[in-house]
Amino acid sequence: ISIEDVEMQATLLDTPTANAIRSTLPLERTVNTWGHELYFDVGISGETEVDASTIVQIGDLAFWPPGSAFCIFFGRTPASQSNEIRSASPVNIIGSINNPPINKLRRIRTGTAIRIAVTS
């Protein structure tokens, strides 16, 4: 995952949603921000999976079905309560960033280009 000078390695899970997104890669988009979440449309539709959740962890990659959006979580969002990280509505967890560079991610603004590709 590349955003400006931020290069990150991530692991995708073997789930129907993760595999659908994997099939769209490489992908270049511009990000939107919502608190400490980056998200962008990936142009696929998907259902909310049975293990979808609104509570996520730092570094989680997720798919938000209502917005057909790929989400990168790195801290609290406007929906968070206390110290939790909460999505707007249930998301399908599709993977995670290995050692997320939280301070660098906090500098990313809406409209910044992102590129996601499979490296191995």
Residue spans for each PLM region:
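A short beta-strand micro-motif
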Residues: 1-3
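Short, contiguous acidic and Ser/Thr-rich linear segments
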Residues: 8-15
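Compact, glycine-rich, soluble single-domain proteins
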Residues: 24, 32-58, 64
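Short, basic/aromatic beta-hairpin or loop at an interaction surface
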Residues: 29-42, 82-96
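Mid-chain, well-packed structural core segment of small domains
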Residues: 51-92
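Well-ordered alpha/beta subsegment
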Residues: 86-120
